């Protein structure tokens, strides 16, 4: 029998001790003191960070919103039906993150970045914090590239540039979402990733939007984030921040993105609900004092970055719903003061058949003019003024019947320009075609066409140009300006078309 050597035994024991790992998991755990309306009061989590993700033993998750002396107010993501007094809560020591990158494109997600379209998991290793600091002044560049929506009234009168924040505001059922969807459809082939964030919308409405995007082939460069009316207030509050985190990824990787928040009125209401349950003091219209800050920190993240940072951009089109056209309410005035202009949609215009129902007088773009192409500037330079004078004359003619010849002519021209700016939904127009039809209206080529036939004139003009003079459209597209030769050619083409056009 071989004897065991003492050295061997000691070396084996030493080896075992050296490689011994204590398999124990340290966790900071607290207990739920009370739970109601999607908010849990948790005791015993002293080292928790603001907006840190916390896990409940029931499998629910939430974020620490209120950090008090002896307890933490936690917003629960779902409805937390199984959470009750005594439920244990664990720290994750991480802030809220969502998946980003090309893996999310073409998908429908919830506010947490989880897929809800039945197309399987999102396969990505890239995640981003939903709360990020907005780029500073030195990291930005002034807006100078156009972001065309394909809507004549917007691209000519309220132009939007890449990196701009342009508010779409109006009563319900005035076509706000349609304007935003048109803008997404028009980004096809422009290398712009589009993110549509639905906040507090009906599930059926969101399904319709997704169907429209799929129908026009826009879903292949879009992401839809849905926090519907049936979701909790916490999900509705988080959705825009998840969306902007996904948009920032493309902005920071020298690419371009467009984000639509539909709509921020419902976002403010969701935040008000959470704040009141957290017992925060209410202010005007029962909104908490920091309701301005939740929107300003969200919209400031849309920017055009400087060349050193890759020259990427994130453009934001927030939507706000007004009550009976009241733009002086609390949330509308807040967001008007944050954004770089607004597109105001009016119920009266909508029902009188002027669609998109854009009130040109109240709509403005504070920085987009610098991004407008020269050709559009040339043809629509006096358009806003002409339309304002037409509206003034129109109001005057309701009382006075006899008008001088010049006023009559102005009235006739104005009526035709209003018709020119009409556009069917989901049919965005390339900028070169917009230039042609606005030029035709502004230079009097439509004066002999009856007002009712202006839309028909336009519908026939575009196929005529594409078939016989595609080089005219091509030149406008490449030159981005109307020089003397191109203008002369355009006049010749329009005169020729007028001869062939029959009403």
UniProtKB/Swiss-Prot annotation:
It is a peripheral membrane protein. GO terms for cellular component: plasma membrane; proton-transporting ATP synthase complex. GO terms for biological process: proton motive force-driven ATP synthesis. Its main location: membrane. SUPFAM superfamilies: C-terminal domain of alpha and beta subunits of F1 ATP synthase, N-terminal domain of alpha and beta subunits of F1 ATP synthase, P-loop containing nucleoside triphosphate hydrolases. F-type ATPases have 2 components, CF(1) - the catalytic core - and CF(0) - the membrane proton channel. CF(1) has five subunits: alpha(3), beta(3), gamma(1), delta(1), epsilon(1). CF(0) has three main subunits: a(1), b(2) and c(9-12). The alpha and beta chains form an alternating ring which encloses part of the gamma chain. CF(1) is attached to CF(0) by a central stalk formed by the gamma and epsilon chains, while a peripheral stalk is formed by the delta and b chains. It comes from the Bacteria. Pfam families: ATP-synt_ab, ATP-synt_ab_C, ATP-synt_ab_N. It comes from Helicobacter pylori (strain ATCC 700392 / 26695) (Campylobacter pylori). Keywords: ATP synthesis, ATP-binding, Cell inner membrane, Cell membrane, CF(1), Hydrogen ion transport, Ion transport, Membrane, Nucleotide-binding, Translocase, Transport. This is ATP synthase subunit alpha. InterPro entries: ATP_synth_asu-like_sf, ATP_synth_asu_C, ATP_synth_asu_C_sf, ATP_synth_F1_a_nt-bd_dom, ATP_synth_F1_asu, ATPase_a/bsu_AS, ATPase_F1/V1/A1_a/bsu_N, ATPase_F1/V1/A1_a/bsu_N_sf. The lineage of its organism: Bacteria, Pseudomonadati, Campylobacterota, Epsilonproteobacteria, Campylobacterales. GO terms for molecular function: ADP binding; ATP binding; proton-transporting ATP synthase activity, rotational mechanism. Coiled coil: none annotated. It catalyses: ATP + H2O + 4 H(+)(in) = ADP + phosphate + 5 H(+)(out). Belongs to the ATPase alpha/beta chains family.
């Amino acid at each position: 029998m071989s004897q065991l050597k003492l050295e061997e035994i000691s070396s084996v024991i030493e080896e075992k001790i050296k490689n011994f790992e204590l398999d124990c998991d340290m966790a900071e755990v607290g207990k739920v003191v009370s739970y109601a309306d999607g908010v849990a009061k948790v005791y015993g989590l002293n080292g928790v960070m603001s907006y840190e993700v916390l896990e409940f033993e029931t499998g629910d998750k939430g974020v620490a919103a209120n950090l008090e002396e002896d307890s933490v107010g936690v917003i629960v993501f779902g409805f937390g039906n199984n959470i009750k007094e005594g439920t244990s809560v664990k720290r994750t020591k991480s802030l809220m993150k969502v998946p980003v990158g090309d893996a999310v494109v073409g998908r429908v997600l919830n506010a947490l970045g989880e897929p809800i379209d039945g197309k399987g998991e999102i396969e990505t290793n890239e995640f981003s914090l939903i709360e990020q600091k907005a780029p500073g002044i030195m990291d930005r560049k002034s807006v100078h590239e156009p972001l065309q929506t394909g809507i004549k009234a917007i691209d000519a009168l309220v132009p939007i540039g890449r990196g701009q924040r342009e508010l779409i505001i109006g009563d319900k059922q005035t076509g706000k979402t349609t304007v935003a969807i048109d803008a997404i459809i028009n980004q096809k082939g422009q290398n712009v990733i589009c993110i549509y964030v639905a906040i507090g919308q009906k599930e059926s409405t969101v399904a319709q939007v997704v169907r429209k995007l799929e129908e026009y082939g826009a879903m292949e460069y879009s992401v839809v984030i849905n926090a519907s009316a049936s979701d909790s207030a916490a999900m509705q509050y988080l959705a825009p921040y998840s969306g902007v985190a996904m948009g920032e990824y493309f902005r920071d990787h020298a690419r371009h993105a467009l984000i639509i928040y539909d709509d921020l009125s419902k976002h403010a209401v969701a935040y008000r609900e959470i704040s009141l349950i957290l017992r925060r003091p209410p202010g005007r219209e029962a909104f908490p004092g920091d309701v301005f800050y939740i929107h300003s920190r969200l919209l400031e993240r849309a920017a055009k970055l400087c060349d050193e940072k890759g020259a990427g951009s994130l453009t934001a089109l927030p939507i706000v719903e007004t009550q009976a056209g009241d733009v002086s309410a609390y949330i509308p005035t807040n967001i008007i003061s944050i954004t770089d202009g607004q597109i105001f949609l009016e119920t009266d215009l909508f029902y009188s058949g002027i669609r998109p129902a854009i009130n040109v007088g109240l709509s403005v773009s504070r920085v987009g003019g610098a991004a407008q192409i020269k050709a559009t500037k040339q043809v629509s330079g006096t358009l806003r003024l002409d339309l304002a004078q037409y509206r003034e004359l129109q109001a005057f003619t309701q009382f006075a019947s006899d008008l001088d010849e010049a006023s009559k002519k102005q009235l006739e021209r104005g009526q035709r320009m209003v018709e020119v700016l009409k556009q069917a939904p989901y049919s965005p127009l390339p900028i070169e075609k917009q230039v042609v039809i606005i030029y035709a209206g502004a230079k009097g080529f439509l004066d002999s066409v009856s007002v009712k036939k202006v839309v028909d004139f336009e519908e026939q003009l575009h196929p005529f140009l594409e078939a016989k003079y595609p080089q005219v459209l091509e030149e406008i597209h490449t030159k981005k300006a109307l020089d003397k030769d191109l203008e002369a050619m355009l006049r010749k083409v329009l005169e020729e078309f007028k001869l062939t056009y029959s009403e």
